């Protein structure tokens, strides 16, 4: 099954504790802890991503980037990237999976991203200005 916004929303609606909003090209899914995951369907893959913090809030970008490269593989199914949004760079956590993935795999990806966001924020907190922690 190739996923689209409608089919992902139908699946997300079955998950307890998830709040779903349809946006122009993605779904915004929030859990009961206030973590937001944005899911983008494409022809070949689904991307699930969550904003971590703005690059401008990082005290030591080189140090953080070195730590990210050494540690992001410690948490399953999720990696770290930098994405520009409205002219500002943000660190994001994301996962990618095949657009032919089974529904259980899609749910696992989103659930894992929800869990990993908090872990990444804790792991990288020493590199952030106080107001971002």
Enumerate the predicted regions with their spans.
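Long, highly charged amphipathic alpha-helices
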Residues: 7, 63-66, 108-119
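Short, highly charged C-terminal tails/helix-capping segments
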Residues: 125-133
């Amino acid at each position: 099954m190739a996923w689209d916004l409608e089919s992902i929303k139908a699946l997300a609606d079955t998950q307890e504790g998830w709040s779903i909003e349809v946006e122009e090209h993605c779904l915004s899914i929030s859990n009961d802890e206030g973590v937001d995951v944005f899911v983008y369907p494409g022809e070949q893959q689904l991307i699930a991503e969550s904003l971590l913090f703005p690059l401008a809030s990082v005290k030591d970008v080189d140090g953080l980037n070195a730590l990210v490269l050494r540690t992001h593989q410690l948490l399953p199914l999720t990696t770290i990237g930098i994405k520009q949004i409205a002219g500002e760079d943000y660190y994001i956590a994301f996962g990618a999976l095949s657009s032919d993935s089974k529904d259980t795999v899609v749910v696992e990806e989103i659930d894992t991203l929800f869990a990993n966001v908090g872990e990444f924020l804790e792991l990288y907190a020493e590199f952030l200005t106080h107001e971002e922690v």
